[in-house]
């Protein structure tokens, strides 16, 4: 079956999740549990996607862990790891314009949570285009940060 290789860590997480959902301990899980199981592992399949997977994979009976790994290799689409970053920017983007004020961003990143030093922020901000009104497009900022 095509798809991506899974790391030992991913397989261990999947084994743990699988065993939690295998409530009767028979080593098998009902097809109806697949969506919850995938979501517990960072996937975010829609009901339509789950129906497609079930049809494509002919999932009509409970399946075991090796079959589950095959399904995950083929179908697990993890949430983009930059989503929390995008969500944080959206909070600062009060008018939903796709831009944030450099001053607001500086304040948040140098004073909340794992604080950046002001000189670290200055290094980051030098890598993006700041508009004349003092804002940046956060998609550009995220793209540059994620690329590093």
UniProtKB/Swiss-Prot annotation:
Domain EF-hand: 9-44, 80-115, 116-148
Gene Ontology MF terms: calcium ion binding; enzyme regulator activity
Statement: the UniProt record of this protein carries the keyword NADP: no
SUPFAM superfamilies reported in the protein's UniProt record: EF-hand (SSF47473)
Keyword Metal-binding: yes
Keywords: Calcium, Metal-binding, Repeat
Residues at which Ca(2+) 2 binds: 93, 95, 97, 99, 104
GO cellular component assignments: cytoplasm
InterPro entries named among the record's database cross-references: CALM/Myosin/TropC-like (IPR050230), EF-hand-dom_pair (IPR011992), EF_Hand_1_Ca_BS (IPR018247), EF_hand_dom (IPR002048)
Protein's job: Potential calcium sensor.
Record's protein name: Probable calcium-binding protein CML7
Organism lineage: Eukaryota, Viridiplantae, Streptophyta, Embryophyta, Tracheophyta
UniProt gene name: CML7
């Amino acid at each position: 079956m095509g798809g991506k290789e899974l790391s030992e860590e991913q397989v261990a997480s999947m084994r743990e999740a699988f065993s939690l959902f295998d409530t009767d301990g028979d080593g098998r899980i009902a097809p109806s549990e697949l969506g919850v199981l995938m979501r517990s592992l960072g996937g975010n399949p829609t009901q339509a996607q789950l129906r497609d997977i079930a049809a494509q994979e002919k999932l009509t009976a409970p399946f075991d862990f090796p079959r589950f790994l095959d399904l995950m290799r083929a179908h697990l689409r993890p949430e983009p790891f930059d989503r929390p970053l995008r969500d944080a920017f959206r909070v600062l983007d009060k008018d939903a314009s796709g831009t944030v004020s450099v001053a607001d961003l500086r304040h948040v990143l140098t004073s909340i949570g794992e604080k950046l030093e002001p000189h670290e922020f200055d290094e980051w901000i030098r890598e993006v285009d700041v508009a004349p009104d003092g804002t940046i497009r956060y998609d550009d900022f995220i793209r540059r940060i994620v690329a590093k």
